[in-house]
A protein has these predicted regions:
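Short, solvent-exposed loop/turn and secondary-structure capping segments
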Residues: 82, 92-96, 101-104, 174-177, ...
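Aspartyl protease catalytic domain
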Residues: 24-61, 150-263, 344-356
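Aspartic protease catalytic domain
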Residues: 22-35, 168, 318-389
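Extracytoplasmic, non-cytosolic globular domains
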Residues: 222, 266-315
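Cytochrome P450 catalytic domain signature, combining two hallmark sequence patches
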Residues: 96-124, 196, 236-238, 285-302
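Disordered propeptide/prodomain
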Residues: 2-80, 108-109, 118-127, 140, ...
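Short hydrophobic beta-strand that contains or immediately precedes a catalytic carboxylate
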Residues: 70-72, 79-84, 90-92, 181-182, ...
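Signature of the N-terminal lobe/flap region of pepsin-like aspartyl proteases
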Residues: 60-161
Length: 389
């Protein structure tokens, strides 16, 4: 699955005749418990220290996505990417892309002495039934060419990293203030896998603040303990969750109440690239029933709901998502009422879209939860940690 945030609420699921998987380089295997026998000190790899990179907020009336700089090539060219826990590969606009990518900074592979053209072409099409700007047909489609080059993040360098150059894209991508996407899935790949092999601890942390607060950041290989008070609560990924960041939740609460529909156990995906939250239709309806009868589906854009903008800001809409910590203790991640309003619909600006989208088949949360916590994404221990901020 390739899933990230577009505009106000899309979770993009890749469907493609010629899928990215076909073109993808074989992921590097990371041996997480590799050091069993003692190794002579002289052979011990030198640990890499964690690095922190600042993130900017793609804000369109609401916080959408957070992106930062990496460098690619020799000499290095700066490429801005969304660090997306909902996907796993690196792709960015290149000079092979013509006018379609003119709003993005383009990487010029001819200026990099370390660039290797692998030359496999593929395309990836994104589809979902929901969104303020709904996906229709193939209106979110990237054309890609596989390659390898040096990639650096915060000064840590990974040679010969698999990546994809965007050679064409549909117009919907034109508004992005960044050039690409760096997947940060629960199985380390690309630059992150290389850095782990070089001795970097196999975790990263996100501090995704609202635009008004600023100073958002990602720490690769560590935890920035200056960004929260109190302690981190860790929960384990379910066995077999593969590369998806997912936690089991036994129950949802809205405004302190629960119902039989909300008491169901479900696995919830954590996608830093998506800002709205997605639940199956019956769950979304049960949640809205505890907020206001005036919130109704916005039929022009399937999966979305809305209410008159002048009613929305006074509605209590506290969502508690229950989880179980590694020690067996229950804890909640809480979305405050202030997240309910994600802004006016384009086709009717008097109606404001509400946070929860109906999406049958999965449950997914993103930025609207993550910006209220410091989050730790522990690949090596297959767990996630949260501390309130
Ligand atoms: C990314 O680098 C550009 C300069 O190339 C700089 O203007 C911008 O502020 C940087 N963005 C972040 C989030 O650090
Ligand atoms: C990466 O490549 C550079 C230049 O070829 C080399 O100096 C460096 O040692 C390489 N780094 C690693 C970790 O292999
Ligand atoms: C770069 O990676 C490719 C694919 O993994 C490998 O075949 C090639 O030998 C590597 N090149 C160098 C210089 O390490
Ligand atoms: C890029 O894609 C658009 C469709 O989105 C298509 O019309 C156009 O011909 C493509 N350009 C190239 C150079 O392939
Ligand atoms: C931690 O608590 C202190 C004292 O209340 C406060 O001044 C500080 O801003 C807090 N730091 C964070 C990162 O929340
Ligand atoms: C989670 O939230 C619900 C609803 O507000 C509350 O009843 C429950 O006590 C909370 N659980 C924890 C562990 O705080």
């Amino acid at each position: 699955m390739f899933c990230f945030k577009r505009l106000l609420s899309l979770c993009l699921l890749a469907v493609s005749a010629q899928t990215l998987v076909d073109a993808q380089a074989v992921p590097q295997t990371i041996h997480l418990q590799s050091r069993v026998a003692p190794v002579p000190a002289t052979l011990r790899r030198r640990a890499l220290n964690p690095v922190t990179v600042p993130l900017a907020d793609f804000f369109l009336g609401t916080d959408l996505q957070w992106f930062g700089n990496i460098s690619v090539g020799t000499p290095p060219q700066t490429v801005s990417v969304v660090f997306d826990t909902g996907s796993s590969t690196l792709e960015f606009a290149s000079t092979l892309c013509g006018a379609a990518c003119d709003n993005q900074v383009k990487f010029d592979s001819t200026k990099s002495s370390t660039f290797v053209d692998v030359g496999t072409t593929s395309s990836i099409t994104f589809s979902t039934g929901v969104g303020v700007d709904p996906v229709v047909g193939a209106n979110y489609r990237l054309t890609l060419r596989s390659a390898r080059d040096t990639v650096s993040v915060g000064g840590l360098t990974a040679n010969n990293t698999s990546l994809f150059l965007i050679t064409n894209q549909t117009a919907k991508f034109g508004i992005d203030p960044f050039s690409g996407i760096q997947g940060m899935s629960a199985r380390a790949q690309g630059f992150f896998a290389s850095l782990i092999n070089q001795g970097l601890p196999s975790l990263f942390s996100l501090f995704l603040t609202p635009q008004a607060v600023g100073h958002a950041e990602m720490t690769v290989g560590g935890i920035d303990t200056t960004k929260f008070n109190g302690s981190l609560t860790f929960a384990s990924l379910p066995a077999g969750s593969s590369s998806t960041w997912v936690l089991n939740s036994p129950q949802l609460f809205v405004n302190g109440k629960s119902t039989s529909v909300l008491k169901a156990s479900r696995n919830i995906i954590f996608d830093s690239g998506t800002s709205n939250i997605l639940f199956p239709t019956a769950t979304a309806n049960a949640m809205y029933a505890l907020i206001s009868p005036d919130i109704v589906p916005h039929t022009a854009e399937p999966g979305t709901y809305g209410i008159a903008c002048d009613l929305i800001d006074t509605l209590p809409a506290v969502i508690d998502i229950a989880f179980t910590s590694q020690s067996g203790a229950p804890f909640n991640l809480t979305i405050p009422s202030s997240e309910l309003n994600v802004g006016p619909f384009a086709d009717n600006p008097a109606i404001c879209q509400t946070l929860i989208n109906a999406f049958d088949g999965l449950s997914l949360v993103g930025g609207s939860v993550l910006k209220h916590y410091y989050s730790v994404w522990d690949v090596g221990n297959q767990r996630m940690g949260f501390a309130a901020i």
